[in-house]
């Protein structure tokens, strides 16, 4: 079964700064069962773990992964993890997640029900993955999110991904507004070339404590986009806000020790309380910006898991 072999092509941002390699150069293991999947992603041996078929469980099932892994879905639809939640552990680091589809049942909706949960380790790249979501309503009681990156996880990039059809989107940083200085600076996270469609709040995310560089993303059908909470340091560049922007919910600024700067987004993302950022992304890595029009076109055509080939911004 064919699968993406682009390896480190397209690596960008803080993940590139950390020299993430995943399982590059290691053995290739194709898995077709949950038991084989659990075994292949564990430990520290350099491994490219290929989903040879989609995997589904009837109940929420947590799979802990180790380090030095590339976890990649095959083309042709053999790349779906349903009700399977990937979790870091204290020894996790240097992992690539690519061309995966994360699905979950509507009934799995508690606060900590999050399909990709990164709370330990340095160096992760989440690329060309999809979270298709499900139907939801304002009064359905759901508290689950799509992805969490926080605590001491660090040097991470989310690129070319699709997040859609969910009440809550993404949550980043130590998940409390308790001014806990132990978590200041975590995570360093790049969020670029992603497509957020019909996410009510937290797309691109609720941000706390870390350094967040967010550029060339398209957010459509939303109520609140950025939620800037405790001690977040956010740089937004040339993002596009579609339906929902007329309600001026681009930045939910809590004014709680954070900084926020927007450069050229359409329409502008304006923080009402937080002062300008005091750091620059370019001091950490090099990158190129698309125009907002080009960024919107790019993500609509190329973001998310793919059936035949992965494309990357030039």
Curated annotation (Swiss-Prot):
Q: Which residues form a coiled coil?
A: none
Record's catalysed reaction(s):
Eliminative cleavage of (1->4)-alpha-D-galacturonan methyl ester to give oligosaccharides with 4-deoxy-6-O-methyl-alpha-D-galact-4-enuronosyl groups at their non-reducing ends
Give the protein's recorded name.
Pectin lyase
Extra information: In most stains, pnl production is accompanied by cell lysis and production of a bacteriocin.
Name what induces it: By DNA-damaging agents such as nalidixic acid, mitomycin C or UV light.
What keywords is this UniProt entry annotated with? Answer: Lyase
Query: Which species is the source of this protein?
Result: Pectobacterium carotovorum
Q: Does the keyword Lyase apply?
A: yes
EC nos:
4.2.2.10
Q: Name one GO molecular function term.
A: pectin lyase activity
The Swiss-Prot or TrEMBL record describes its family as follows: Belongs to the polysaccharide lyase 1 family.
């Amino acid at each position: 079964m064919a699968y993406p072999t682009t390896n480190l092509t397209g690596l960008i941002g803080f993940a590139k700064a950390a020299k993430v390699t995943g399982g590059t150069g290691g053995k290739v293991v194709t898995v077709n069962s949950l038991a084989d999947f659990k075994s292949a992603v564990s430990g520290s041996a350099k491994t490219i773990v290929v989903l040879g078929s989609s995997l589904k469980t009837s109940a929420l099932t947590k799979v802990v992964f180790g380090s030095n892994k590339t976890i990649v879905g095959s083309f042709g639809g053999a790349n779906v993890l349903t009700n399977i939640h990937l979790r870091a552990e204290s020894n996790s680091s240097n992992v690539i997640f690519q061309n995966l589809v994360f699905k979950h049942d509507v009934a799995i909706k508690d606060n900590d029900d999050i399909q990709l949960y990164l709370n330990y380790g340095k160096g992760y790249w989440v690329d060309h993955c999809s979270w298709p979501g499900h139907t939801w309503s304002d009064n359905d009681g759901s508290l689950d999110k799509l992805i969490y990156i926080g605590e001491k996880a660090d040097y991470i990039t989310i690129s070319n991904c699709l997040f859609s059809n969910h009440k809550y989107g993404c949550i980043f940083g130590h998940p409390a507004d308790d001014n806990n200085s132990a978590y200041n600076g975590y995570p360093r996270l790049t969020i670029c070339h992603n497509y957020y469609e019909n996410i009510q709040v937290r797309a691109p995310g609720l941000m706390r404590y870390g350094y967040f560089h967010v550029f060339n993303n398209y957010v459509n059908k939303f109520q609140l986009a950025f939620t800037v909470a405790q001690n977040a340091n956010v740089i937004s560049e040339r993002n596009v806000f579609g339906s929902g922007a007329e309600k001026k919910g681009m930045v939910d600024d809590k004014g709680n020790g954070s900084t926020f700067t927007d450069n050229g987004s359409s329409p502008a993302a304006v923080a009402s309380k937080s002062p300008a950022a005091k750091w620059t992304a370019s001091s950490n890595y090099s990158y190129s910006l698309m125009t907002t029009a080009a960024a919107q076109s790019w993500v609509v055509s190329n973001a998310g898991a793919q059936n035949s080939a992965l494309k990357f911004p030039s």
